[in-house]
């Protein structure tokens, strides 16, 4: 499972059982640290997730985004509640790529804003899966 944490929402994506492709699952509206962690942990349990991929926002220069000050405490709260393996994944340009993907899939423009984070999470997860595949060969 992958999460794309923003200031107002958290995009969630899952992989198929073979861990080859990622798909958007849902977008959670941010409600506070403990509430967000509880919602994400519920999804971890529901989908029997062993590894959580967390989008790591960086500027094109490579410098860390200030949003990390919100993401780190959330990840620590999840880690405190569940013994899930955490992996960080560079998410540069994921939102722009998500917009392109939604346009390709003909997602209506009025729905794109609501679905952007979950599509970005799916891209983050797909990038992680591809990196893992490359490391195996």
Regions found by a protein language model. Name each.
Residues 3, 8-137:
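Phosphate- and other anionic-substrate recognition elements at nucleic-acid/protein interfaces
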